[in-house]
UniProtKB/Swiss-Prot annotation:
Listed EC numbers: 2.3.1.274
Localisation per UniProt entry: Cytoplasm
KW Cell division (keyword) present: no
Organism in which the protein naturally occurs: Shewanella piezotolerans (strain WP3 / JCM 13877)
HAMAP family the UniProt entry points to: PlsX
Protein name: Phosphate acyltransferase
One of the record's GO molecular function terms: phosphate:acyl-[acyl carrier protein] acyltransferase activity
PANTHER family: FATTY ACID/PHOSPHOLIPID SYNTHESIS PROTEIN PLSX, PHOSPHATE ACYLTRANSFERASE
Length: 342
């Protein structure tokens, strides 16, 4: 394992340095080979670096800027007018080879726009995709993409997403021949719109992707597949609905376990199991969405992430950098194109 550097937008998200800096300190304690460049207002950042050990501080660099991309900034406005923002500088550090990955909890649209313009897409990739991990009943991760970077997609784009998702599962989780499916309104080949049907036909012709066919919404968490592909409109609604249901179940479970004397006693007895169950359903446990298909690594954290959730996103960015995810995707695409043309 070699040293790596993470560029971190310290000002992004709902809480800025109050969350990003303490989470960074935790990550540095966990990984002695990690260095972090914190981009943002040095005065605010320094306030949260006070408890850091000298050895930890030596692995932190600060790029000072007071400009921030706000949550209300439109992507085009951010591109044109936020050229000294903490988000943009963090991405530029990846572009210039000074960092191997970038992480931000800021404005998603601005992050995607800046990343695509500054880092460019990989050869053979038309559009980057936003992908995140979901829980499954067998405790294996399931990747869902796209989550909103591309509201509408043609069949070729869905095909590219399937290839990238397959490589992601192999690279990050070491899954052997990940099972890939297209999210659809039915499993029959005649179901779905033209784009989904045509994407399925393309994938059937590519042996390098273990395409299993269509999958319906009620099978997303079954663990029967490793990668689920859809356009960003469907994916974003699916993700947000999942997070809402998880919070509802958590609320109802906590409420139910406080009603009645004997129930409260039982709850204390099985508290460790309840805690484990709630943790599995907690969306923060899966924090960190990757913008894949770019020539560099960009990870988006939830804006409302707490310290533990932001640490999860840091760990994801580090893992993708260590395993050279963009290069792995590029190599796989090159192999597929060679087979198609041979």
């Amino acid at each position: 394992m070699t040293n790596l550097t993470l560029a971190l937008d310290a000002m992004g998200g709902d809480f800025g340095p109050r969350i990003t800096v303490p989470a960074t300190l935790q990550a540095l304690r966990l990984n002695p080979l990690l260095k972090v460049i914190l981009v943002g207002d040095q005065v605010q950042i320094d306030e949260y670096l006070v408890p850091a050990e000298p050895e930890i501080k030596r692995r932190i660099e600060i790029k000072h800027t007071t400009e921030v991309v706000t949550m209300s900034d439109r992507p085009v406005h951010a591109l044109r007018n936020r050229k000294q923002s903490s988000m943009r500088i963090a991405i530029e550090l990846v572009r210039d080879g000074k960092a191997q990955a970038c992480l931000s909890a800021g404005n998603t649209g601005a992050l995607m726009a800046m990343s695509k313009v500054l880092l460019k897409t990989l050869p053979g990739i038309d559009r980057p995709a936003l992908v995140s991990c979901l829980p499954a009943v067998n405790n294996t991760p399931v990747y869902l993409l796209d989550l909103g970077a591309n509201v509408s997609c043609d069949s070729e784009t869905l095909f590219q997403f399937a290839v990238m998702g397959s490589v992601l599962s192999e690279t990050v989780d070491k899954t052997v021949s990940p099972k890939v499916a297209l999210l659809n309104v039915g499993i029959e080949e005649i179901k779905g719109n033209d784009q989904v049907q045509q994407a399925g036909q393309l994938l059937q012709q590519i042996p390098q992707v273990n395409y299993t066919g269509f999958i319906e919404g009620d099978e997303i968490y079954s663990g029967n597949v490793d990668v689920i592909v859809c356009d960003g409109f469907v994916g974003n609604i699916t993700l947000k609905t999942s997070e809402g249901i998880a919070r509802l179940l958590t609320h109802q479970l906590k409420k139910g376990l406080t009603e009645g004397f004997f129930v409260r006693i039982l709850a204390k007895i099985i508290a460790p199991r309840i805690h484990s169950l709630l943790n599995q359903m907690n969306p923060d446990h899966y924090n960190g969405a990757s913008l894949i298909g770019l020539r560099g690594i960009v990870v988006k954290s939830h804006g409302c992430a707490d310290e533990a959730a932001f640490l999860q996103a840091i760990c994801l960015a580090v893992t993708e950098a260590q395993r050279r995810l963009p290069q792995m995707i590029e190599d796989r695409l090159e192999s597929i194109l060679l087979d198609i043309n041979s």
